[in-house]
Structure formats: C-alpha cells, structure tokens
Amino acid sequence: MQKLQLFISNTRVDLFKDESVSINQTIQNVRDIAKIFTEFTQTFTIPASKTNNKLFKHYHNYDIVNTFDARRKEAAEIQLNNVPFKKGFIRLEGVQLKKNKPYSYKITFFGETVNLKDLLGDDELSALDLSSFDIDYSFGNIKNKMQTSTGGFITPLITHTRQLYFDSGGNVGNGNLHYASSSSSNGVFWSDLKYAIRLHEIVQAIQTKYSITFSNDFFDSSNATWYNLYLWLHRKKGDVEPAQQVSMQFKTVTGFGLESDPPATTSVSGNGVNVSSTYTTYPNTILGFTFTFIPTTTDVYTIRIFRNGSQIFQAEDVTGTQLVTQSDFTLASGTYTVAIGSTSTVTFNSGNVRFAVNGNLGGTDDGSVTAWNDEWRSSSQTVTGTTFEFRINEQIPKMKVIDFLTGLFRMFNLTAFINDAGTIVVQKLDDFYAASSITHNIDEYVDIKSSSVDVALPFKEIDFAYKGLGTFLSKQFEQLENKGWGTIEYSADSTFDAPSDTYKVEIPFEHLQYQRLVNATGGANTSIQFGWFVDDNKESFYGLPLIFYAIKQSSSTTAISLKNTETSNQSMSSYWIPSNSRAISSSTSTDNIHFDLEVNEYTGGSTFTGTLFENCYKTYIQDVFNAGRRLTKVKAKLPLKIIFDLKLNDKISLHNRNYRINSIKTNLTTGDSSLELLNIV
C-alpha cells in the first residue's frame, strides 16, 4: 500500500483514508488514432477539512468575496511515498454538502500537457507577434521577396485571381509570363501575388508568446521536411486590399517603452502591449485606461486599435490630440496594437502615442487589494504614408493557434509529452516508440484469474484527407479521378465486413494542385510552376490556410515577367515556386505532403513515394490492420518501481511476448492496474 500525497498550489491537501485515486495513461489509442492524450484521474473526493476549505475558500458559500475561481485549473503534484510522481493540474468539479455543511470536494487531476490547450485558449494566429516581418506591399518588395535567397519570408508564385501561362511567341497582357521586353504587357501583375511565411517562424512565435519550449526532435531547422514548409498569407479572397482603400494606408506604431515606475503589471511583446487575463478576471479588475495620440500637425488621420490582431476600435478623420478611453470599448485580456492612417503625411514623435492603464489586484484572504498603474509610450517616430503596409497579424489566415498545431500534429502523426525539464517533447510517433529500449516484465504481478483478448481493429477503413480541396484544379481532379487530391482510403488492400466504422483523419488546411507551365510555342517544359487559388468557377477563393513547400528556381531557369504597371515589367530569372513535394527531383528527396502517392506536378512521374502516410502513419496503421494484432486486457498489481519507471513508449513483456501499451489505469494507493496491450507483430 502506497502513501498518496496531493499538493495543490504547493499546499498539501487532506485526503480520505479510504479514497481510491486511479490515473489513466495513454498517448496513442488504437480507438482514436488522430488524438493526443494526457494523463487524468477519475473524479475523486477529498474531505472538507480546515486545510481544504481554506484552499478552496469555502466554495459552497456564494457570499464570500474573493472566492476560489473554479473556472481555472490549479497547478498540482501527486507524490507517492514522499517521492514526486506526476505534475499537472486539478479542476474543482463541485462540493458535496451534508446537513447544509460542506462534506467533500470533487476534483479531477490532469497531466501537464492539458495546460497547452488552456494556455492557447481561443487565440488566433493573428495574436502572435510576427511584426518583425511587417513590410510595405509594393512592387519593389514583392520582387525582392521573389528573388531573396533567405527564405523566412518570401513571395511564392501563387496568384489569387489571374491564371498564368507561358508562350514565347505571344505578346498579350493576359497572364503570359514570357518576358518580351521592358515595355510589353506580358507578365504577372505584382499585386496578383502575396507573401508567405515559413511555418517554423510561426512555431517560434508560439513558443515566445506562451513561454513554452518545444523540443527540436521535429521542430528543427535541420529537419528539411518540416523547415521548408510555408504558410501563404491569404486572409481574404482576391486582392490584399480593395482599390478604394489604396488612398489611405496605415502604419503600425512600432514598439512601446515603459514610462511609469517599474515593475510593470502589463508587458510588451513586439509592437504590442499585453494585458494578461489574470488582471481582467475577478477578483482582479481593470479600473481604467487611456490611449493618447499627439500628432505634430493638424492634418486629418484615422486611428485603429487591435486586440490579438482583430480590429476592435476605429476613430475616423480626427485631428489634433485624441484620447481613447473605457467609454469607447472594454479592455479585455489580449495583446493591443495600434495603427494610424492618413491620406497625407502625419508625424507622431517618439513618446507621443501612449497607453496608460490602471487596476486593482485582489484575492488575498483578508480581501485587501493592491493598486497598480502602467504607462507605455511609443519608442520610435510614427509617420503615415501612401504605401500600404502588409501587417502579418492582419494578413495571416484566420485560424486558432490550437487548430494550427493540431493540424500539424495530425499531418505528421506527432505526439507530445512534457519531460522533467518542462520541455514539450514533440516527436513523430515512430520516433517516440523507437526512443525507448526498455521492457518491463510483469508476469509475476498479473492476475491470472481473468483476462481477455479482443479484436484490435476497430475500423473497416481509415481515410486521410485535407479538409480544403475547394480550388479549381483540386475540384477538377476529384471529378475526374473520383477521389480527393492527395487523399487515401486505407483498408490494407482488403475489404472487411466485421468492423463497420470508417475513421477519418482530416487536416484543416487547403491542398492545391499546382501547374508546371509548358511553352505554348513548341511545347517545351519551362521551369515555372505556379498555384492558382480560385474556385471551380475560376473566381477568387477564400479557402482554408494553405501550406506548401517553396523551391527556389535560380539556375538554368525560364525567366518570367513581373509587371509593375500595365506597360512596364521586369525580367526575373530567379523566383520561388510552390510545390507539394520538398524537391523537384525525387533523387534529391521523395518527401511530399500528399497522403496518397500522386503524379508529381513538376516531373509528371510517380517517384515521389515519401507521402505523409508512408513516412508518418504506415508502420502504426499497418500494425493495426494486421490480422495477427490483438488487444489484450489484463489486471496486475504493479510494484511502486514499475509505477514510477514506466513510460508509455516502453514495452511490456508478458508470457514471453512483447507488447505496446495502448492504455493503463492504475490505483495509486494499491498499485492495482488495468492494462490494454497491443502485441507486437
């Protein structure tokens, strides 16, 4: 019998002597392949003792000021025999009363990875600080980012409306990329293109914003399969900005410095001021705030204020000093940025865009509060202009951060756990299992009175697909081939009639079919490949966020024509082409982001065999569909050494056979465990 100890917010709580606390552990479950799991306990009860009542602040009493906030999980740790076992969080489920007095509290323990979802919340990608990539949207910059050799931020050859082609014998300005002369009308107009950002930069920004660290097992610059992927910065269909807005362009106020005495309660990141939910949530409160704008002239200007990248306030056509206060909008938690626009040049000197906010910190046992007051001022001069500024938080696709990460995890079959150093270890599932060589023999601990051997195959078929298959060529492919572009329906080349369900792994991104251009005069292949982001009516398309590989074409390439105006263009012999494969030659790499083997758009061949299914899912899924695979259920009384040492990628040895752990449920006081094991075939 182990001694169970539970600490909540560093306070050891009292436990019932006979309370049973069981923890469930699984990281990849054969019944729900696309999900990543975390440890959790069954809901259990602890007594309403003096210590526990103080911790939960007599939660049953509605009238108590500064009560326990059950909307939030609290940090917790489970110890066994005074030795740390699991760190995580507890959630208060409720209070049981007897004779109108508190008798017990119902709580649930969750492993540390559950905190990731809580941290990210409903934040969208626009809440991330990617302001270092903000850039004017102009012919010069579009051209420069098409030719740049450093690929963190590029212009790929993807058009939002115009269809492109190549004809060395033609000289008509309707999308012909052939460069005839500097005064011809051939070429792609620069504003038909948009920028793209490397996915790695987004993941780096996630780590910075939420103060988390991912391991470099997968998210690493040396992993080209990951590092060469990009996100197209496409937030609205068609043009980046409608033509009627071109006369007024907005400039972001770049950076704030603390004017009030330190330490600050709020904080800054990039070009924004962060207001934590801690300070907007009861018992803490925001008392007031003021944005102040002091221009050097009396010219007309417009103010826009953003929270997490979404505009929440606008004051149009104002002059002179302006104040924006709590009478204009409510200050909720988030990152606040400011942009100023004008049809003329308006200057705001350093320090003349200001954000002052004050509030109270409550929550002490005696109900006392502490007042705080922060003032932030712009750290550089802001000057409006007539060139449109491409701000990443306004142009990045509308998508929650958690959905973005979940999409990547499903795409590459990644799994995650938190190590002793607090790092979130992210690995492909195959690598996770390969990382452990430890086998635990449990023969002597197994209850031989009862066990079962069940069918391990819960599905007749597993479908892998992208949710976004709405562009013209992807739709056309589906109509002609009767399958989704890049989609696979896996059933191990057999039709099973015992299981009846189909499991779907669906990725929340758009998946384009690209076009390699052929010279209409003579029929020779060019080095040009482009993406046409339109719907099946050949009209501008919104779609889902687009992920693609970018490949630099710079030697022995076909020059293309980039148009500045209708009668002015420039020849470009280096440019970034989009691709579903990491390379344009399978001798360099066969990696691609299809699930099924498809004809490569650039080569026309089928040698790019490194699909997502082949590289990330095949080993696990083929094992699931193997006729020899069984799901064995046993009960065992595990000793404390195994309970402490067991990792979910370890093997279990039972009766001279090795097994993978599908799930394990353990009573932490008795060691009684129920194990689901998958035999290794």
Task: Identify what each model region corresponds to.
Residues 1-258, 353-388, 392-411, 431-438, ...:
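Polar, S/T/G-rich
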Residues 241-303, 307, 348-378:
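Terminal (often C-terminal
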Residues 311-320:
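Solvent-exposed serine/threonine-rich low-complexity stretches and specific carbohydrate-binding patches
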Residues 280-287, 320, 332-334, 657:
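A glycine-anchored, Pro-Gly-centered beta-turn/N-cap motif
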Residues 339-346:
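Short beta-strand-plus-loop segments that form exposed binding edges in beta-rich domains
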Residues 322-329:
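Exposed aromatic-hydrophobic patches
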Residues 86-95, 657-667:
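Short beta-strand-centered aromatic/proline hotspots
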